[in-house]
Amino acid sequence: LLAAYRVALETRAFAARIWAPQQAVLAVTMVLLWVFYWRRRMRGEETYDPPAPAPVQDRVLFSATGAACLLFIGAILAGVHTGIQLGVAATAAAVVAVVAFAVRDRSALRPALIPWQLMVFVTGLFLVVPTLERFGLDDAMRALIGEDGGTAGAVRAAFSGAGLSNVLNNLPAYVAGESAVPAPNKDQLLSLLVGTNVGPVITPWGSLATLLWFEWCRRWDVRVPMRTFVLAGTVLAVTGSAAAVGVLLLTG
């Protein structure tokens, strides 16, 4: 969404451009999951029997919240053409879901559902970036990314974005990197987008999705060894970003 204006591709054209790199990332992820976790020697079991699906307790509530998700996705896609703001789409979907719970299961609505700490943290990151830009972040990103519109520039953009994402967060990292990419270099800009989406899996704060995942792991008392997380994330960030950028350039 942050990249929509600069990339300047219609929804279908953007999906067609990114589809193959996305498949490359998924393939790399599956290979690494097999290497690190799915192999018989690693899992310690002969077979894996998945648990039975949880039954739907309230089909009306399930349908209403499902409709809220579809509304959100539809509004995002429509917003590319109509200018609907992300905040408006998110608010509308949230209102539908909250009203549904208020009618069907009011006890489920509680302040603890809102990730207040993460909201403050991410907001703070966006405030930090302008300060860092005043002290040379823009110059540093331009030096790292360069102006080459070819393969070297694409690789530099992807890995610079991935690196800064793991230091700060991928949202401000993309904003900082975007300003360093020359306007005509579309492949370099898409490579930056790839790096800031595939790469931030090394540190817990690399992306909002990872922060939310860690938060729910904590709530459910699921222990995540930090050493394993960092090592596996490093391998995935490097190989996944390289594969995605390679396919992006080959299919461009």
PLM region descriptions:
Residues 26-105:
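Long, contiguous bundles of hydrophobic transmembrane helices that form the permeation core
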Residues 4, 17, 21, 25, ...:
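Alpha-helical transmembrane segments in multi-pass membrane proteins
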Residues 3-4, 9-60, 198-252:
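Juxtamembrane and boundary regions of transmembrane helices in multi-pass small-molecule transporters
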Residues 1-7, 159-185, 189-220:
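Alpha-helical membrane segments and immediately flanking helix-loop junctions
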Residues 71-187:
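Transmembrane helical segments that form the transport core of multi-pass membrane transport proteins
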Residues 24, 59-62, 66, 120, ...:
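Catalytic cores of large soluble enzymes that bind and process phosphate-bearing ligands
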Residues 11-22, 56-61, 78-91, 110-115, ...:
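Interfacial loop-to-helix junctions that mark the boundaries of transmembrane helices
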